[in-house]
A protein has these predicted regions:
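Alpha-helical transmembrane segments of multi-pass membrane transporters/permeases
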Residues: 21-26, 144, 155-184
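Interfacial/gating helices of multi-pass transporter permease domains
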Residues: 42-63, 233, 237, 259-279
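Helix-loop junctions and terminal segments of transmembrane helices
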Residues: 70-85, 286-303
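Alpha-helical transmembrane segments of multi-pass membrane proteins
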Residues: 127-154
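Short membrane-interface helical motifs at transmembrane helix boundaries
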Residues: 107-129
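Interhelical loop/hinge segments that connect adjacent transmembrane helices in multipass membrane
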Residues: 2-16, 211-248, 306
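Hydrophobic alpha-helical transmembrane segments
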Residues: 171-181, 185, 189-216
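Interfacial transmembrane-helix starts/ends
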Residues: 17-21, 55, 82, 88-102, ...
Length: 313
């Protein structure tokens, strides 16, 4: 029974529509869990100061993720490893994973050092509250997330190329389960930092589920000193997208800072509305795009123009 389940989970999904339906189904499950998560937050904290602090603590780590991880994201790696030589693919994955670990670690370390000052500048109202120390600790804890999810993003490039879409779609489900577990089990013991621990656990689960795919494909990254020439070949194509994502994250940070100035619950209402808005895009647009992209990348690499057009149509 267990072996049959594992075989189903790890089996490649070849058909485009089959992959899209699978992704949409698991995305729906993930979004339902996200709604359960938000409902738990509203029940546990209410749309007040504690929930404001939780959502506000994500904004700086999200900005780091947008600026660093998007430079070497799966969307840039997939066209380079789809149908490519395994040795070259592993070299590229090792280079990008090492860059993310080093650059993300340095940036997050510097921000962690100056977190109290930064939060006072961005969220002066929240830093004047009774939970300022917990807010600082939670933000520092969440700075682990960009590094972990960045590495997971590199791993998902292999998962998508190998068309293990069940595993790919399961990772955000595990992420939300980690947050829910942190809210239910760790918050009563540790308070608000306990929810942050759940976020980190969820991020680790998001990454770890891809490790067997990396091992099976013999593409497990090794720690190396990044080669600027290799990285530049990747980054030059991702700079426009990275700048757009970075600007989007910065705008969200600015809007969250403004929401924090409107009074208690402002950040919570703004964030919950944004979470609801993302549901239809994730269910429909992202599912087909995720399923089609590795197939299109492989057709392009192999110069299969007819197959490329057929997939799009």
């Amino acid at each position: 029974m267990v072996s049959k389940l594992l075989k189903t989970i790890t089996q490649p999904v070849r058909g485009l529509h089959q992959a899209a339906y699978l992704l949409a189904s698991l995305t729906l499950a993930s979004q339902v869990l996200a709604l359960v998560r938000d409902r738990l937050f509203a029940h546990q904290f209410g749309a007040g100061e504690m929930l404001d602090l939780y959502y506000a603590a994500f904004r700086v780590p999200d900005l780091v993720f947008a600026l660093v991880a998007s430079l070497v994201s799966a969307y840039v790696l997939i066209p380079r490893i789809a149908g490519a030589d395994p040795v070259e693919s592993r070299r590229l994955i090792s280079q990008t994973a090492s860059f993310l670990f080093i650059a993300g670690g340095i940036m997050c370390g510097v921000i962690a050092l100056f977190t109290p000052t930064l939060l006072t500048l961005v969220y002066p109202n929240l830093m004047q509250g009774a939970y300022a120390s917990e807010f600082v600790f939670l933000t520092r804890l969440l700075l682990l997330q960009p590094i972990i999810l960045g590495l997971s993003g590199v791993a998902t490039s292999v998962t998508q190329v190998k068309r293990k879409f069940f595993i790919f779609a399961l990772s955000p489900v595990l992420y939300n389960l980690g947050i829910i577990g942190g809210t239910v089990f760790l918050y009563p013991v540790f308070g608000l930092p306990g929810v942050g621990m759940g976020v980190v656990i969820g991020a680790l689960a998001h990454f770890i589920i891809h490790v067997p795919v990396l091992m099976e494909a013999k593409l497990t990254p090794r720690f190396v000193i990044p080669d600027p020439k290799v990285l530049w070949l990747v980054m030059k194509d991702s700079l426009p997208r990275s700048m757009a994502l970075g600007m989007g994250a910065f705008v969200t940070l600015a809007l969250t800072a403004l929401a924090a100035r409107t009074g208690e619950g402002g950040v919570s209402v703004f964030t919950l509305a944004g979470n609801l808005e993302a549901v239809p895009l994730s269910l429909i647009g992202a599912a087909y795009a995720t399923a089609a992209f590795p197939v299109l990348a492989e057709h392009h690499r192999k110069k299969q123009g007819v197959a490329y057009r057929d997939t799009i149509s």
